[in-house]
Amino acid sequence: MAPGGGLPRPVSSSHRHAGRYVPAMALVRILVDGYSLLHSWPELASSRPRHSAGARDELIRRLTLYQDAYGTPISVVFDGAGAPSGTPAAASTHAMEVLYSRRGKTADQLIERAVHRFSSFGEVLVVTDDHAERDTVISLGGTVWSCWNFIQDVENALAEQAENISHRNRQEKHRFQRRK
């Protein structure tokens, strides 16, 4: 933990490397408690229920952009009896995995199992506001961020990424105009 009890934030201590934003800590995977994050991020579902398919889709879209910026694989895990009907078969990739717990299992159980398996390969970050889950993840060797910290990091990373893309586009536009 950083001074003051907060966790270190990758954006504030990150640097650019080959077009990616590299966090100070090397992460093997980021595991997200999907409904915990949706509950803490009301802007994702301003006109629809927080646990709706539209809110989940927006969360997945933003996490995919965040994964594109950092390059660290992300698994977002939702409670439920499998994927909801109408969920596209290709919703997951290796870099952005979308998981739904099976009947009789919880997202927490899937996250704990993943932390146990991935921690032998390096640092695993879990995003949740569930205090019991946080304690379990820490006991398994994982690192935990609150949803609020993660939301701030995602928003900062996406703003920085958009600014860098805009800057790069302006540079290319000027370079192209000089050739004429």
Name each region found by the language model.
Residues 1-24:
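N-terminal amphipathic/basic-hydrophobic helices that include classical n-h-c signal peptides
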